[in-house]
Amino acid sequence: MSAIGDKNQFRIIVGSYEHNILCLSLDIPNQKENDAAKTPHFMPIFHFQAHSLSIKCLAVSRRYLVSGSNDEHIRIYDLQKRKELGTLLSHQGSITALQFSHPASSSEDAAVSKGSKNSKWLLSASEDHKIMVWRVKDWETVGTLKGHTARVNDVDIHPTNRIAISVSDDHSIRLWNLMTLRNAAVLKLRKYNTNGTCVRWLGAKGDYFAVGLRDRVLIYETGSAKVFKEIVFQRKTLMHIETHILPFDNKEYLSVGISDGNVHFYPCEELFEKVEENEKQEDDDDKEDISPAFSLLGHTNRIKDFKFYTNEFGTYLVTIGSDGKIVVWDMSTKEQVAVYDCGERLNCLTLCDESIEKYNTMKKRDAETADIGDQSEVESDTEELKKIMFGEKKKLNKKKRKQLKKSKVSVELE
């Protein structure tokens, strides 16, 4: 991810219960500038009603923006041209999650993604118990991942793009082989009375994954497929989880959004530490809450979604809440950078580069083209105007022409 020139800019796209999509460009001034110019500036890019019901999820891959809604539709937009490309209609239930595959970043990934810098697949989850796999090149359906018997709440793709993981209201976690589009494994949540609401892979190689329940986070080891660590929240509801490498210590953190407006940060290194068998038995008898390394409070009520953005200027956390506010944090200082009140009930969020939009591909008209184009048909054709006003002149034959010449009278003055 990169900024434009010397400007620290990126775009924030949010979806709301009011069926709208709002895109804002955030300009964060550099510290070298004078005090008057140090105030961050939000500039609206577009704001429109995208669906007939509330928007549940958003995802971005380079130039493409996709949105999922309770109206069972997935809409595709080209951010470079600010144009809607179409609608995906295969689901028969509300869209609950959208996830693009990872762009190829190594030789191993390039073999999977065929060297393309853009995402190859889009995964969409729905209340119809299905996960659809779409080919981004032509937006055709590659296949359907079937196996869940209830609403699919979330889905995430492994860093290798070969495996996906999903959680559902059927009280299970499923692993999918994206090479064969078949179910690879099923994990049951037998010891817990709540369903998984969100899931994320952990570690650079995806050796672990985190499953968020209503009141706790379960840390699984991928190899053994067993829970070896739990983060419990007393009298609080988990809303969302993400993972990212933070700049102040260059380590990966698991971030957890809570219903009280807080985002808690847990170092993944500590979560990955093995627990001895005797200690594990004691923990089962008397569990102690794992305390976060630090927390950020930016909302008065529950957090709905949050994402991280990294460019040459630093790493930023963007959170949205039911209070309608967008809060931006600088993770190097752990301080708020900017706040924007949308006046709507926000539900989902995604981020993209400011350079995503190519102005030369947009439909623009210069002054001369605009002047010509704005003229009416009558104004642009003077000959047609004369015909309408005075009638069309009839062509004269040779005899009539001679008669006109003879009838002409010449007058000379003495």
Swiss-Prot record:
Cell compartment(s), UniProt: Nucleus, Nucleolus; Nucleus membrane
Superkingdom of the organism of origin: Eukaryota
Chief location: nucleus
An annotated GO cellular component: nucleolus
Signal peptide: none
InterPro entries, sorted: G-protein_beta_WD-40_rep, PAK1-Kinase_Regulator, WD40/YVTN_repeat-like_dom_sf, WD40_repeat_CS, WD40_repeat_dom_sf, WD40_rpt
N-acetylserine modified-residue sites: 2
PTM sites of type Phosphoserine: 376, 380
WD repeats: 50-78, 90-135, 147-177, 189-221, 238-267, 298-330
SUPFAM superfamilies, alphabetized: WD40 repeat-like
Modified residues (Phosphothreonine): 382
GO biological process, one term: ribosomal large subunit assembly
Annotated membrane topology: Peripheral membrane protein
One MF term in the entry's GO annotations: protein kinase inhibitor activity
Keywords: Acetylation, Membrane, Nucleus, Phosphoprotein, Repeat, Ribosome biogenesis, WD repeat
Other remarks on this protein: Present with 3730 molecules/cell in log phase SD medium.
Function statement: Essential for cell growth. Plays a role in assembly of 60S pre-ribosomal particles in the nucleolus. Also required for replication of the M1 double-stranded RNA of the L-A virus. This latter function may reflect an enhanced requirement for free 60S ribosomal particles for the translation of viral mRNAs which lack poly-A tails.
Self-association and partners: Associates with 60S pre-ribosomal particles.
PANTHER family: P21-ACTIVATED PROTEIN KINASE-INTERACTING PROTEIN 1, PAK1 INTERACTING PROTEIN 1
Full protein name: Protein MAK11
Gene that encodes the chain: MAK11
